[in-house]
């Protein structure tokens, strides 16, 4: 936005407010890259019984790292589906649904992942904001 209040639509601005204040997504998806570059457990699975990728645990063999994966950047998130480390969620709306349920209650999941209520209008606004993080010049490059 760089100080230009007209660069985002009304819905995108409302989505930003949800993202940064009400839902506090910004705790893990901080500016300017919309990531902390830290590994966290986002509650994708209630348990990791060996069938699922156990995340950083595979590297460090530290049980506190079970289910922890690097927090992804949300830049160009509209182009990076399917979502989650294993591609198990196919849409931004479904990602929001996962988080609105407070994840799947893994004992090591990040403390900020808690249940929340969001209306369908608010969900639309949040998705609009997330889509605004798309760099259209990126998709026009030959390498893309």
Label each region the model flagged.
Residues 1-90, 94-107, 141-144:
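Short glycine/threonine-rich turn/loop motifs
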Residues 88-135:
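Extracellular low-complexity, Gly/Ser/Thr-rich intrinsically disordered linkers
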Residues 132-133, 137-144:
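In a subset of proteins, long, contiguous C-terminal domains/tails are tracked
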């Amino acid at each position: 936005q760089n100080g230009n209040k007209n660069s985002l639509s009304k819905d995108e601005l409302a989505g930003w407010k949800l993202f940064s204040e009400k839902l506090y997504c910004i705790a893990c998806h901080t500016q300017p890259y919309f990531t902390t570059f830290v590994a966290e457990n986002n509650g994708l699975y209630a348990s990791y019984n060996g069938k699922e990728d156990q995340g950083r645990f595979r590297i460090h063999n530290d049980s506190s790292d079970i289910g922890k994966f690097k927090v992804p950047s949300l830049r160009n998130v509209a182009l990076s589906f399917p979502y989650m480390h294993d591609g198990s969620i196919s849409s931004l709306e479904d990602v929001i649904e996962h988080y609105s349920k407070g994840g799947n209650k893994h004992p090591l999941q990040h403390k900020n992942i808690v249940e929340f209520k969001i209306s369908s209008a608010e969900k639309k606004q949040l998705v609009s904001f997330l889509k605004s993080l798309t760099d259209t010049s990126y998709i026009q490059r030959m390498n893309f």
